[in-house]
Amino acid sequence: MKVRKMHYPLFSFTEYLSCYIILYFFVFLPNYSYAININNYHNKNNLWNINNKWNNQQSNHFSNNRIGHFLWGSKIRKNPLASISTSITTKKLENQKKKTNKNESYSNVNDKYEHNNNTAHFVQINYKNDQSNDTLSTYKNNNEMTVEGKPNNLASGEGKKEIHNTTQKILEKVDYFKEREKITNSYNNNNNNNKVIVTHDNKNHTNYINKVENKQSDDKIKNLNNKYIKKFKSHILQNDILGTISTMFWSGKKNNNGNVKKGIKNVPMDEKSYSPNDHDNNSNNSNNNNNNDNNNSNNNNNNNNGGKNNSYYNEKTQKGVNDKETNFLLKALDSGKFPTYCLVENIDENLDNFDIYMSKEKMDELNINDGATVLLKGKKKREMLGIARLDRSLKKHYVVISFAMKKNLRLMHNDIIKIHPFMNAKRIRNVVLSPFSDTIPNLSREELEKAVIHPYLKNSYKPLRVNSNIYIYYKNNKIEFKVLKIISEESENEEFGCIGEHSQLTLAEEYLKREDYEENNDDITYEDLGGMKKQLNKIRELIELPLKYPEIFMSIGISAPKGVLMHGIPGTGKTSIAKAIANESNAYCYIINGPEIMSKHIGESEQKLRKIFKKASEKTPCIIFIDEIDSIANKRSKSNNELEKRVVSQLLTLMDGLKKNNNVLVLAATNRPNSIDPALRRFGRFDREIEIPVPDEQGRYEILLTKTKKMKLDPDVNLRKIAKECHGYVGADLAQLCFEAAIQCIKEHIHFLDLDEEDFIEFMKISVDEDKKNMGNEPYGSSHTNNSNYINHLTESSNKLSYTNMFPLNRKNTLLQNDKNEMNKDSSYDKKTDALDNYKNDSTIDMEKKKNKKKSNFFFSNDDEETKNKNKTNVNQKKKKNPNDKLDKNERRIPAYILNKLTIKAKHFQHALNICNPSSLRERQVQIPTVTWNDIGGMNEVKEQLKETILYPLEYKHLYNKFNSNYNKGILLYGPPGCGKTLLAKAIANECKANFISVKGPELLTMWFGESEANVRDLFDKARAASPCIIFFDEIDSLAKERNSNTNNDASDRVINQILTEIDGINEKKTIFIIAATNRPDILDKALTRPGRLDKLIYISLPDLKSRYSIFKAILKNTPLNEDVDIHDMAKRTEGFSGADITNLCQSAVNEAIKETIHLLNIRKKEQEEQRKKNKNSFKIDDTDTYDPVPTLSKKHFDLAFKNARISIQPEDVLKYEKFKEKLSLQDF
């Protein structure tokens, strides 16, 4: 007999499993849900009081304020089901008392609560035994929590005891927060300062925690505190109960993940964390959204503290960093050999001039603190001082720089910047600054010093360097200053210095002129290149990396590339890229223009090449740029010139002779890559060939931005719209477009250049608006805006000066209307350093009048050296001038307020678009037609089919991508002659703003073998370059006849084969449509009309009554008609007429009216002649110009036209097209 163990009679047998399940659903769950509801009810009535002590708790847990808490204690959770039959022991209460006694060790509390995107953060800073060890706890209200003092990933072997202990600790801390709330409130009331400074001994830097200045905002934060503490505790209690129930039958088993327990979702500390020493002020921005009363003050504080706006983060996330492009650089930086090197991740124009943001890891590596002064080194040995700022969101090797650092150090995205700690900045006793004259508005010298320079630099402790530029915003104008001289206590000429309390700020007597001061003003930089980011990054990888860091390739075990070949159509920027790389890479550059190498003497051409390569190998790193390489490296197999063959052979030998990793690289450019000798295009010589394509819409917009950055544009100019209309334009074409727009602007205002000087100035003054006259003599680079609301907004906000809130300047609305009375102040014209008044005294003018007897062009100055020297001596004797005076006789300059009238408007760009064509398509007549849908009457169904086929793929391309479908490539329009097939093709091209290439069928055929096929290839190449483009083949039956016909015309067969190949080669990236028109569809090759080529076949039939009426309306819309003309009746009478026949009818009616008019004028003239002969003295001839005998087109003219009208299409011809249409429909069926 087997004896059973009866220690736990109910919970020991597996046969009672069904009972367990019933107890689980009908006993436990109702109990727990009831406990939770009671708990939520007490929380709503604020029964969870912070004065309740742990030692006052009684054993009846369902009647106390902590409902259900002790029911799930850590001890009982080891056996949760058995806990129902047991009670809480006294030992449990003693343990809780011991844990609460630990809270007495806290000496100070500082709570900071954040609420952003429905997420509550509870932050606690603990100070114990006067130490500055801060601990951080972040909790989320969406069932996510991170436990302070415990690792995030719980080991799988740990039991549920650790979970309950952790939960109890969290509840204790939440209660303690509530209990210490009174202390925090009293502490906040006693502190009147806006900031609390917390010093961390272990981190050696000071952190600022912005306090809320407003009492209302304090109350709001307290309410949020109470609200989210309640939510947080209820979530913890629910998680505890659900976690206990779910692990009831799985005691001791591991979770599948091995790290995460049931009911708790771990959040890594690095994923969402907050630190009080973080200078990122996004939390302040979120608080500002909740507190509308303090928006302005908080925003200013954010900017003064070097914080970044939300726009910076949006821009940073949109741009990102391409890992492929910076792969080599990151490997080099990760190696640890270059600790001072960093990559520029972003250039934020909202930052202060001297702020550079970097990661905590990089600061620790450089041994610098937040707010420390650093020395920054950029390209061409350019240096600048900056202030290091902390940004925890940045990666280790990336930094964010300001706009001033970009300009001073000549940096761009993903460029290398060197950062060094700088400890030798001496206190500045005096610093001399000078603004650039083209950036200052109409400000006096006193206002420039007191209102611009002093508020920004005085007592700012900003580091300065000689010859560095700083940018200050004042009244919506970005004023650029240059540091000319730094004087310290020890030296009169210091290179670096730091502004102190006793530093003096001096404004230079003479303002700087940009054209005189800046060196190499015509140098091309990467900023001047637009629309070619991908190509430029590839070229920089292959050129700058081998030149700057050859050890990277040596460490991998490969040789650096020796040559790069750029090819593309003329005007895309190949030469500009080469010049920019040579200018930016700090390398020697030898430029070889192809024809310069050629010489008539034997051996001299090869000797020139050898000398250049020898010099390049001596001065490394070096770039040899060969422009138009096709002129010296043609294919030797097709060349009959021995000189060209020798030059190509010498170039091959020299490129093979380049040693590995010797920092010499050959860069070549050509627009005919197929004409270069194939031996040059192999690996080891020109390793990589990079095509510089025609820019797309975004690229054209970027090019327009660079080309117009110095132009005075009217606010109505929309560069996005212009870029969208410039299909097929390259960089040179867009430069010409801007030039033509400027010329058109000048023509509008100075079309009277033949006037005398005095008349010219008076005429210009009359043409200027009165309100702009009153603005005075303003700088030439300024522009105006006609938007009164915008001007009023700027005027109101101009009283507030915010220097660190450096928002980007809108170049269209750069000038704020200044005070009109300011120009009348005598002080503004007494200053000898006023850069806008360059008038001479009367004595100098008299001397010049004696010397210069000839009248000169008033656009230029006739000053000689003596006059200029005397002008310098008499500069202090200037007289007051009214800016509205006439043209200065000495300088021959037009007053600035007149020049400000010359602003380029949208209509000027529209005129330039009409006269400019893409340079790649000038060999063919490529234009956007002017025919619109209104010019074509009727055919509404055909118009809709054309829109669906051509317009939809251009405007709704994303929908085709959504359904993974291709658009139709071609359309065949067939029908009787004169029904409007050509007009329809032109109208759809105008509707979608696409380039239109019209090809007459026979013009592609030539007598030379292979030239016809080459013409077809060239046609499609040009269309691809100008995409989106429509190629219209008119009379395609002359090209694409059926190939099995016995015509013995091999050339036509080859042409149609080439056309079929080109149509099949149209890819999705190049949007090209083929429209063909024919009146002989029966003789076309069947391969051309299959789906995938000419997909849609549209029959253009004779117009019906409604269409004929519409055609009459379209033709006669601008013709004066008499009342007796009935268009509807004429539409009925023209049964069987085509569109061309109706046009001919209307033209015949007009001819009849003109014939009648001439006849009546001749009769009147004869009558006047007879009257003159009869009455010689008294008769006066009337003005025949005002006499119009036939003012309108009447019914009788149309009746005469109907007598001579004829029908060009016979009914039997129409039957042929109808039968062909039925044949196609049967085939489709």
Curated annotation (Swiss-Prot):
GO biological process: autophagosome maturation; mitotic spindle disassembly; proteasome-mediated ubiquitin-dependent protein catabolic process; regulation of cell cycle process; retrograde protein transport, ER to cytosol
SUPFAM superfamilies: ADC-like, Cdc48 domain 2-like, P-loop containing nucleoside triphosphate hydrolases
Composition bias, Basic and acidic residues: 268-281, 819-837, 882-892
Pfam families with a match to the protein in the record: AAA, AAA_lid_3
Residue runs in coiled coils: none
Compositionally biased spans, kind Low complexity: 252-267, 282-314
Family matches, as CDD domains: RecA-like_CDC48_r1-like
PROSITE patterns: AAA
GO MF entries: ATP binding; ATP hydrolysis activity; polyubiquitin modification-dependent protein binding; ubiquitin binding
Record key words, sorted: ATP-binding, Cell cycle, Nucleotide-binding, Repeat
Residues reported in the UniProt entry to bind ATP: 568-575, 975-982
GO cellular component: apicoplast; cytosol; nucleus; VCP-NPL4-UFD1 AAA ATPase complex
Region (Disordered) residue spans: 252-315, 814-837, 860-892
Family (UniProt): Belongs to the AAA ATPase family.
Name of the protein described by the UniProt record: Putative cell division cycle ATPase
Lineage summary: Eukaryota, Sar, Alveolata, Apicomplexa, Aconoidasida
